[in-house]
Curated annotation (Swiss-Prot):
Enzymatic reactions: nicotinate beta-D-ribonucleotide + ATP + H(+) = deamido-NAD(+) + diphosphate
Nucleotidyltransferase among keywords: yes
Protein name as it appears in the record: Probable nicotinate-nucleotide adenylyltransferase
Catalytic activity, EC: 2.7.7.18
Keyword annotations from UniProtKB, A to Z: ATP-binding, NAD, Nucleotide-binding, Nucleotidyltransferase, Pyridine nucleotide biosynthesis, Transferase
Enzyme class: transferase
Pfam families: CTP_transf_like
InterPro entries in alphabetical order: Cyt_trans-like, NadD/NMNAT, Rossmann-like_a/b/a_fold
Function, in words: Catalyzes the reversible adenylation of nicotinate mononucleotide (NaMN) to nicotinic acid adenine dinucleotide (NaAD).
GO molecular function: ATP binding; nicotinate-nucleotide adenylyltransferase activity
UniProt keyword annotation of Cell cycle present: no
Length: 189
């Protein structure tokens, strides 16, 4: 059975924290690949102004292009409305019955697991992999695999704020993503 990691998110913008998490889990669990799963509309972010799907996808392609073990999965972008992990993973497990999926989540999402849509059924479809993030403990009543990673306190919301404040984001996200953001005037106030 193939072992594939999945890291979901808005990737608004993608940054070195996403890449670090994906790479550390890839090596720690001896995965074949890690698929980045950009969300259409994450249920926990409804109502927030999110950058266009086209721009987020382009930035994600630029961020992941150098790693042959990283791929982009468009499953959630093909649907309209909120993206529920259960619905997506049900589709993916039917499409790829020979794959054992490892769904990678940060410490903030580990604590939020009890609120996930159809969590009990989702546990039959994936193995959750929790990675530590500063300020969060990996506490949950659900079974998760834990992977220790070096702390790198960067987030997409921090980067959007830094761009609005016209602060440098160098060394926080891939240079090609930074160039794309600046050329397209993303995250300006």
């Amino acid at each position: 059975m193939r072992k594939i990691g999945i890291i979901g998110g808005t990737f608004d913008p993608p940054h070195y924290g996403h890449l670090l998490i994906a790479n550390e889990v890839y090596h720690a669990l001896n995965l074949e690949e890690v698929w980045f799963l950009p969300n259409q509309i994450p249920p926990h972010k409804q109502g927030r102004n999110i950058t266009s799907v086209e721009s987020r996808l382009q930035m994600l392609e630029l961020a992941t292009e150098a790693e042959e073990h990283f791929s982009i999965c468009l499953e959630e972008l093909s649907r309209k409305g909120p993206s529920y992990t259960y619905d997506t993973m049900l589709q993916l497990t039917k499409k790829y019955p020979d794959v054992q999926f490892h769904f990678i989540i940060g410490g903030d999402m580990v604590e939020y697991l009890p609120k996930w849509y159809n969590i009990e059924a989702l546990l039959d479809l994936v193995t959750f992999v929790g990675v530590a993030r500063p300020g969060y403990k990996l506490r949950t009543p659900y079974p998760i695999t834990t992977v220790e990673i070096p702390e790198f306190a960067v987030s997409s919301s921090l980067l959007r704020e830094r761009y609005k404040e016209k602060k440098t984001c160098k060394y926080l996200l891939p240079e090609k993503v930074q160039v794309y953001i600046e050329r397209n005037g993303l995250y300006e106030s």
